[in-house]
Regions:
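C-terminal helix-coil-helix/basic helical segment that borders enzyme active sites and/or dimer interfaces
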Residues: 349-382, 398, 471-480
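Flexible, small-/acidic-enriched active-site or ligand-binding loops
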Residues: 248-274
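Alpha-helix capping/hinge segments and adjacent helical runs
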Residues: 4-5, 22, 26, 32-45, ...
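A glycine-rich, basic-preceded beta-loop-alpha segment at the flavin cofactor/substrate interface
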Residues: 246-248, 270-298, 315-332, 466-479
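Extended, charge-enriched "interface" segments that sit outside catalytic cores
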Residues: 1-110, 129, 540-541
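A short core secondary-structure module
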Residues: 207, 211-251
């Protein structure tokens, strides 16, 4: 006998057939404005592919089936390997096919390649964020290695620049594609890498023997890691491959995988170097300088990844509100809910504008002024955006209600993932101290800010007032005010981009909402309509 106790209605269908690129008006505009309009058709193709139920299911599977550490084989021999679910490998294959790991480093890379790569990264991050960790590290390490690959590894250049993902356990020179990891932090130091105790001994052939450990060694299956270790000349950077030139495994012992709050798909490991062999990059004592060259790019990716996850959470929320009816009308038409969603969309508008201006600065970093822009605003963006992510996703959960608190909605996974980008590559205080370091020591930084703010001076009174407040704080930037200064700098960076490129009503609305310290700002109906149209590709009004 068949029972039917009720009919299911007024429940939105899953958001699993959307174009992640074309539905984001702010992103489409930013890509073209910042010099990568030539990639728009390809981005639309990627956006359609990644927005499907099949792609989204890969993200789910990779997280509910986390990696497994294989220390030994059945006969007791060391393996020091990690086994991943097939979904992980398919996600990685798509990332490499779309060149998210090396687009900007191709010999014939087009102007705007960094911008195009940022957009591709953002689209993939909305499907599954953990797989971006190996991609980020490989992207940041590749330009350094193209200049400094040790002599025994010159055959790595071709696979470093390929569009192939190769998970086979083989020496790098025999593979079609490569991944590069980084090993910096140790038990006693964390962000204080100068306290690292891993020690080295120079060998007759010019290589070094490493003895020590790393506390967080992400992507242990990488073909090589860039490792910080102590030498007679100070903290130095070493190229430590998985396989030695003679084909033997390097003595890198995988001890334990971290049991993390989020980022479940990605393997983070504790390792020990038991006479591992590495090759010095640069000179002894240059470790910090070389790591900082890569650190800016990894920090940018942290901010971009958090922004992408915020974008996905917002998409889920507004899609639900568009279909769900309450008190006789769609939820999105309820005044308070419409105001909440519009404020969320406005926040994303400002972040998108600043992040892709940053991508352009990275693309043109050969210009001293652009390099300084990236140097200042990258840590500021990482600090603010990564901190905003958690309450933003929680707000999206509230839009969905109880179902948003359930795993099927994607939102719990996004919420658990959010804190990692605030911690990786330097936590909040480290970012703020870095901003203060630039403000106190970098020549030309105040001229740069003055030029950026003068360009839009007089267009909005809230912006001008905020500039004056920041100027007062910067007369003597105290360390204990580092967070406030960094936050204000970020807001003014966003505001300057909005005033320069957004419609005047939207730019002024952004400035009032984000910079008016009194609060209580009501967005006009027209601004709300414009924001929600842009945020959904013209679907939700």
């Amino acid at each position: 006998m068949h029972w039917q106790t009720h009919t299911v209605f007024n429940q939105p269908i899953p958001l699993n057939n959307s174009n992640l690129y074309l539905s984001d008006g702010a992103l489409c505009e930013a890509v073209t404005r910042e010099g990568a309009g030539w990639d728009s058709d390809f981005l639309a193709s990627i956006g359609q592919q990644l927005g499907t139920a099949e792609s989204l299911e890969l993200g789910r599977l990779a997280n509910v089936n986390p990696p497994e550490l294989l220390r030994y084989d059945a006969q007791g021999r060391r393996l020091d390997d990690v086994r991943f679910h097939p979904a992980w490998h398919l996600l990685m294959q798509a990332l490499c096919t779309n060149r998210v790991h090396n687009l900007a480093w191709e010999e014939d890379a087009r102007s705007g390649a960094f911008v195009a790569r940022a957009a591709r990264f953002m689209l993939h991050a909305q499907v599954e964020a953990g797989s971006l960790c190996p991609i980020t590290m490989t992207f940041a390490a590749t330009p350094l290695l193209l200049q400094m690959l040790p002599a025994p590894f010159q055959d790595w250049t071709t696979p470093l620049l390929s569009d192939r993902y190769d998970s086979h356990l083989l020496p790098g020179g025999q593979k079609r594609g490569l991944l590069i990891g980084m090993g910096m932090t140790e038990k006693q130091g964390g962000s204080d890498v100068m306290s690292n105790t891993t020690r080295t001994e120079r060998l007759e052939d010019g290589s070094y023997r490493l003895v020590g450990h790393k506390w967080f060694f992400s992507v242990p299956q990488s073909d090589a890691h860039l490792v910080l270790a102590q030498t007679a000349g100070g903290l130095s950077c070493f190229f430590v491959p998985r396989f030695l030139p003679d084909g033997q495994r390097n003595a890198i012992r995988l001890e334990r995988l971290k049991d993390k709050l989020g980022n479940r798909s990605n393997a983070s490991c504790e390792v020990e170097f038991q006479d591992a062999i590495g090759w010095l990059l640069g000179q002894e004592g240059e470790g910090i300088r070389l790591i900082l060259k890569m650190g800016g790019m990894t920090r940018f990716d942290c901010a971009l990844g958090s922004h992408a996850m915020m974008r996905r959470a917002f998409s889920l929320a507004i899609y639900h509100a568009h279909q769900r009816h309450v008190f006789g009308n769609p939820l999105i038409q309820q005044p308070l809910m419409r105001h909440v969603l519009s404020r969320m969309a406005l926040q994303l508008e400002g972040q998108t504008a600043l992040l892709f201006r940053l991508a352009r600065a990275w693309d043109r970093r050969a210009d001293a002024k652009e390099a300084l822009w990236a140097r200042l605003f990258t840590p500021a963006a990482k600090f603010v955006i990564c901190k905003r992510g958690m309450p933003f996703v929680a707000e999206a959960m509230e839009v969905l209600g109880g179902i948003g608190y359930c795993e099927e909605s994607e939102l719990p996974r996004l919420y658990r993932e959010m804190p990692v980008n605030s911690i990786w590559e330097g936590s909040g205080n480290i970012m703020c101290l870095d901003v203060l370091r630039v403000l106190n020591k970098q020549a030309g930084v105040y001229d740069l800010l003055s030029e950026a703010f003068v360009e839009v001076k007089g267009q909005d009174r809230y912006f001008d007032r905020a500039v004056r407040r920041l100027q007062q704080q910067l007369r003597k930037p105290a360390e204990e005010l580092g967070r406030e200064i960094t936050h204000q700098l970020f807001l003014l960076g966003c505001g300057a981009q909005m005033l320069k490129y957004a419609s005047p009503p939207m730019a002024q609305a952004w400035c009032q909402v984000m910079l008016d310290t009194r609060g209580g700002v009501r967005l006009s109906e027209q601004i709300q309509n414009d924001l929600l149209l842009r945020a959904t590709g013209g679907v939700c009004v």
